[in-house]
Amino acid sequence: LCYNQMGVPSSVLPGSRVLIVDSFGVLAYLYRYADAVWIGGGFNPSGIHNTVEAAVYGKAVLFGPRYKRFREAYDMLALGGAASYGEGDAAAIAALLKDHKALSAMGDSALEYVALQAGATERIVSYIVLKYLSTSA
């Protein structure tokens, strides 16, 4: 565990095994350095934070049990790019973090999820135009 008061994301220290971030606006820059990413909020009634930000970098996405309101988390679990753990799962998490082959496969699956979402904006805009903006003759 490395403690560092970061001024900028480039201050991530080589060889650090755990990085805990309590700052706004830097996570998207830091995910690339990880083997796996624990997404916060999974033990909180409001649920998890953004899982796609980590998946974009092809990282294994891990989170607590309160993810069911978040479709992307559910879909990533189904593809094998994510895993959900409860309070008693520390040994299982530790085992996964040592299994670099499994982490790599999960990261590939997370990246696959991101690729499957390509074109979503175009599909949504087309739907809105057809449903609400097109004129009938």
Map each language-model feature to its residues.
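Nucleotide-activated sugar donor-binding and catalytic core shared by glycosyltransferases
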Residues: 1-137
